[in-house]
Amino acid sequence: RANGLGTEGIVFGGKRMGLYFLESGASFRNSNVVYDREGSSFATLRPGMIDWEKIFADADWFHWSGIAASLSQEGADACLEALQTADRMGLTISCDLNVRKKLWNYGRAVADVMLPLVQYSDVIFGAEPEYKEVFDIAPVGFQAVDTAYPLDLKGFETFGQKISHIVPRCRKVFLELRNTITSNHNLLAAVLYSD
């Protein structure tokens, strides 16, 4: 509140806040995340709980995350409700795919839920494995071991075109590239496809 951030749109629910635990990796053993979201406020979100028109009244951009659709069918339905309202109100819509397979445990495949939702997005963010999970498009590949690694720009352009073909509304595709050398040594890059 001290910084002028409104809190009147906050919806309270669930039995508790969701938690996650990070077990840091060591050497060649990757980090591990344990999610504890069952019964949490976010996991109990349902359509009709949020007045999206009121929330979006002065907005021009709505950003959503695949995590919102991952916890339950009701959460995915609430996400659809938000997307339809944002679309109707003329907002720019962006999506971070954020596929966390450990969260998808309500019997629906990631692509079956995400593909209809992502159709509302003007901008999409994600890593290669997330695009593979949602769109079933083979990654271009990123095996950098240093900064001299040559990016396959034509391959990434084709990748972006494929996404834009599946999601005609999408004009920008951001792609995170990561090559894990050890648990604490990663090489990162990003590519933007703009239609």
Per-segment meaning from a language model:
Residues 44-51, 77-81, 108-113, 154-158:
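Active-site glycine-rich loop that binds ribose-phosphate moieties when present
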Residues 89-98, 103:
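Short beta-strand/loop segments at the ligand-binding rim of alpha/beta enzyme cores
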